């Protein structure tokens, strides 16, 4: 019964996003966002015995409900001003709408809820929050943005996403700050090319799915669990290490490709200042990924009895290896296809 209800909520979740991105009015987009929100809340409460999960779902609901209320207020104000032939909405109202959409997507400076909510979720729900739940807000943001306000959000997202992950011991919080950093890159791509941010989002979703699949199969939530896992299987340790570097955007992995496309686009547009800041802040994310990887490879940890159980079945192993191969060697394959063509 629970599985059937979860499938219904998952279908409604997808339906809500499709309603938002296909709507031709702000009110229809708002309704789609609400359907999406009310479908995701039951999915978040997959473990009612875990108080941290209940706390995360409550935080998510309060944050999204507040953003939806402000968005509805801004939409009503927009309709009122438009019907009365007033042009006052051009400044305040656009900032209000953009702020609520940035809050819903978890971009800085409205990111405060995102790491805390991620900490209490399962890996499957965390993956949905990092990927699918960003589609509708980002699509609406692409319709309506203010350059100066947008630029502030981009720089803050990259800065907080980089510095926030430095002293983390929780993998879920690290992935949350990494998502904030990548969101800054998506917004930067959105400023110059509408298709570019979609390409970046697809690549990021693929990389996130690849690494979250491994974390979920091994029930990894904290770094010390990865250290103990390294005593069991060096190959799995290596795959996690390479996936982290790919997610950080280090060449020659697939994660470098979307950043490379954004860098090329910014260079062509002669936006060298924001490009320099973006690359420098991305180096910080690579630093804490490399620091974590160094600890996994070089340091020895005592084997704990609770880590002896291997949850990695053959079916999931095959799926994970396929996605890991794409994540790690995708850029090489794309380069070979490009050379052949």
Swiss-Prot record:
Question: Where mainly found?
Answer: mitochondrion
- Which principal EC class is assigned to this enzyme? translocase
Family per similarity comment: Belongs to the complex I subunit 2 family.
Per the record's keyword annotation, is Transmembrane included, yes or no?
A: yes
Protein localization: Mitochondrion inner membrane
Q: Does Nucleus count among this protein's keywords? A: no
Query: Which BP terms in the Gene Ontology apply to this protein?
Result: mitochondrial electron transport, NADH to ubiquinone
Q: Which GO MF terms does the UniProt record name?
A: NADH dehydrogenase (ubiquinone) activity
The way this protein sits in the membrane is described as: Multi-pass membrane protein
Record's GO cellular component terms? mitochondrial inner membrane; respiratory chain complex I
Question: InterPro entries annotated for this entry?
Answer: Complex_I_Subunit_2 (IPR050175), NADH_DH_su2_C (IPR010933), NADH_UbQ_OxRdtase_chain2 (IPR003917), ND/Mrp_TM (IPR001750)
Q: What does this protein do?
A: Core subunit of the mitochondrial membrane respiratory chain NADH dehydrogenase (Complex I) that is believed to belong to the minimal assembly required for catalysis. Complex I functions in the transfer of electrons from NADH to the respiratory chain. The immediate electron acceptor for the enzyme is believed to be ubiquinone.
Please list the reactions this protein catalyses.
a ubiquinone + NADH + 5 H(+)(in) = a ubiquinol + NAD(+) + 4 H(+)(out)
Keywords in UniProt for this one? Answer: Electron transport, Membrane, Mitochondrion, Mitochondrion inner membrane, NAD, Respiratory chain, Translocase, Transmembrane, Transmembrane helix, Transport, Ubiquinone
At the highest ranks, the source species' classification is: Eukaryota, Metazoa, Ecdysozoa, Arthropoda, Hexapoda
Q: Which residues cross the membrane?
A: 8-28, 61-81, 95-115, 145-165, 174-191, 195-215, 238-258, 272-292, 321-341
Q: Which gene encodes it?
A: mt:ND2
The scientific name of the source species is: Anopheles gambiae (African malaria mosquito)
Q: What is its EC number?
A: 7.1.1.2
Protein name (database record): NADH-ubiquinone oxidoreductase chain 2
């Amino acid at each position: 019964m629970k599985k059937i209800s979860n499938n219904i909520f998952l279908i409604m979740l997808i339906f809500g996003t499709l309603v938002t991105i296909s709507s031709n009015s702000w009110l229809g987009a708002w309704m789609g966002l609400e359907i999406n929100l009310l479908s995701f809340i039951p999915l978040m409460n997959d473990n009612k015995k875990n108080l941290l999960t209940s706390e995360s779902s409550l935080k998510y609901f309060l944050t999204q409900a507040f953003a939806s209320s402000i968005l509805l207020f801004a939409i009503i104000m927009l309709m009122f001003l438009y019907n009365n032939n007033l042009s006052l909405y051009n400044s305040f109202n656009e900032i209000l709408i953009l702020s609520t959409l940035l809050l819903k997507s978890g971009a800085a400076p409205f990111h405060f809820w995102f790491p805390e909510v991620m900490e209490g979720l399962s890996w499957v729900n965390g993956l949905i929050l990092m990927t699918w739940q960003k589609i509708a807000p980002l699509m609406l943001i692409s319709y309506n943005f203010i350059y100066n306000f947008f630029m502030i959000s981009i720089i803050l997202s990259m800065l907080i996403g980089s510095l926030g992950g430095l002293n983390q011991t929780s993998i879920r919080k690290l992935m949350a700050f990494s998502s904030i950093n990548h969101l800054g890159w998506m917004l930067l791509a959105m400023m110059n090319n509408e298709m570019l941010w979609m390409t970046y989002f697809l690549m990021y979703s693929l990389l996130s799915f690849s690494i979250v699949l491994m974390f979920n199969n091994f029930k990894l939530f904290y770094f010390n669990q990865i250290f103990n896992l390294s005593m069991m299987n060096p190959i799995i340790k290596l795959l996690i290490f390479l996936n982290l570097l790919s997610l950080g955007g280090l060449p020659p992995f697939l994660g470098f490709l979307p950043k490379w496309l954004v860098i090329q686009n910014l260079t062509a547009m002669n936006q060298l200042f924001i490009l320099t800041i973006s690359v420098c802040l991305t180096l910080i994310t690579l630093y804490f990924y490399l620091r974590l990887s160094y600890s996994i490879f070089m340091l020895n940890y005592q084997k704990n009895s609770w880590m002896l159980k291997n949850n990695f079945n053959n079916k999931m192993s095959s799926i994970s290896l396929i996605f890991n191969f794409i994540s790690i060697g995708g850029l090489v394959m794309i380069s070979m296809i490009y050379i052949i063509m």
